[in-house]
Amino acid sequence: MSRVKILDEETISHIAAGEVVERAASVVKELVENAVDADAQIIRIGISADKTGITKISVTDDGIGMDFDDALLAFRQHATSKISRPEDLDGITTLGFRGEALASIAAISKVTFTTKERGSPSPEAARVVIHGGELISHSAVGAPEGTSVLIDALFYNTPARRKFQKSVPTELSHVYDMVERIALSNRNISFVLLYNGKERFQTFGTGSYPDVIAAVFGSTFSKELTPVSGSFGPVKIDGWITRPGSEMKTTQTRFYLSINGRQVTSRQLQWAIREGYGTLLPKGMYPAAFLDIVLDPRDVDVNVHPTKREVRLSREREVMRCVQDAVYTSLHEERVFSTAPMPTLARETITTLPVEIVGEPVPVYAGKQEMHEARQAPLKQTEKQLRRTESADLPETDLFVPEVLGQIGDTYILAKNESGDLIVVDQHAAHERIMYDQLLARSSSAEAGQELIVPQPITLSKKETAALPDLLDVLAAAGYLLEPFGKDVWMVRSVPVVSSTLGDPDTIHAILDAALDGVGNTDEVLDRVLKTAACRAVVKGNTPLTIEQMQRLLRQLMATKSPYTCPHGRPTTIVLSKSRLAGMFLRT
């Protein structure tokens, strides 16, 4: 007797439904996407729940609707109006196309489907009632144009799937996330989400990205974003990303990416976004990103996953590069201080001050009112550190340089911008950004290093000695020239041109440690070397500065390409607006 049997239609339907309908959010996704494809302008989603779980789901739209016959045909497996031949799969522009959703949902729930075709002269709409895949009724009723789908008793005939549904709050969170993602990709449509009859979420179909982001995440969050846009041949990118220095998260939960209007998940594109941030992104942190990517539909294969959340791109590397470039360009054009002209400050005045002139001590807001003579020697060393980065040509900047007010704890610079907002600057992080940018600009050039008058011998560990020969080219690109001088002893003959003190043994050991961490990737090794060198050569915290020195430091910071973060991604600057201060003091 044959053990191989052809499955009956009911079993086949349940298997298919298991692939398409995982939870309540899956039902919402399929029905809302159908409404989007139906040219709806308003989509209302209703969720009802009690202690047992989600009990009802409804989706109502004002789309094109269906006639009496199509309403019934839509529940047949693989019945669709969106494709008709294999060639159509090569250029899909709709969110749905397989003709599986309604049949799969109807197989594991009780469905009431009401629809009226747009522009129909008939006053009647079609209503189809199906329970567990079995047709209960097909009748004419009165209803407005568009479509309304009511799902009752989800998974009532599949107890195994119902058993594995999570708590109501968890399932609701998945529904909210799904609706929010679709709304972010379809900003010209108004979405309304109700839970147990109460409105929980609404967008207004204005077409504006900031409007939808504000509706989903709040107006405060939307103000922390900066726009991204770019055209790279057939690839077009538009959206918003977290401004450097704003709140980041340790998880990747705020990547909202769409390709040709379809929300997708892509680790490759998430990686490209983070690469676009580069040193502006703190280690281990993730930005928020809302990006629309438009491609030729023929370059996108959406028929690779049951839920269509994953897609395959024929030109994936090119798209990744475009995303990375768009993010990078946006971040380096962003300005958060001011676009007003800088105050007149002759460059000659900055670069020709005698080293021994250190200026008057500044008020210290931490409580000390005077600086003792014993602190003047460190001030002279500080002056030398500041001049290392002033010796290079500074690019012109249209940014207003904040006016220095004082210093807190010999570590933070207080200033105010043109709008009167309070600016707090970490002096070490700021100077580190300046130094890193200058080291990076000189790297791999003949101007990267300067020979020491007296070469500096340094004794290395066995590990350092073994690794150093493979690192010499990278170190040379950074400005370091080291030559062997006996067993485990090397002679430092050249250091980065911005600072001769970068040849001291402690700094060399720190740089070698950083380089060893990045062995195998030349660019990463060089970047680590430059970051370490920058950190070691600049003004530290707990260092008193004069008003003049702080003003010069801010001017140098404003002239960098990325003034808002240090090379490691930590913020250099915090802006306390007047409105934010008012809120902190509970002023209305």
UniProtKB/Swiss-Prot annotation:
GO cellular component: mismatch repair complex
Keyword presence, DNA damage: yes
SUPFAM superfamilies in UniProt: ATPase domain of HSP90 chaperone/DNA topoisomerase II/histidine kinase, DNA mismatch repair protein MutL, Ribosomal protein S5 domain 2-like
Assigned keywords, A-Z: DNA damage, DNA repair
Domain of life: Archaea
Entry-linked Gene3D superfamilies: 3.30.230.10, Histidine kinase-like ATPase, C-terminal domain, MutL, C-terminal domain, dimerisation subdomain, MutL, C-terminal domain, regulatory subdomain
MF (Gene Ontology): ATP binding; ATP hydrolysis activity; ATP-dependent DNA damage sensor activity; mismatched DNA binding
One record GO biological process: mismatch repair
The keyword NAD belongs to this UniProt entry's keyword annotation: no
Entry similarity comment: Belongs to the DNA mismatch repair MutL/HexB family.
PANTHER family: DNA MISMATCH REPAIR PROTEIN MLH, PMS, MUTL, DNA MISMATCH REPAIR PROTEIN MLH1
Function: This protein is involved in the repair of mismatches in DNA. It is required for dam-dependent methyl-directed DNA mismatch repair. May act as a 'molecular matchmaker', a protein that promotes the formation of a stable complex between two or more DNA-binding proteins in an ATP-dependent manner without itself being part of a final effector complex.
Protein name: DNA mismatch repair protein MutL
Organism encoding this protein: Methanocorpusculum labreanum (strain ATCC 43576 / DSM 4855 / Z)
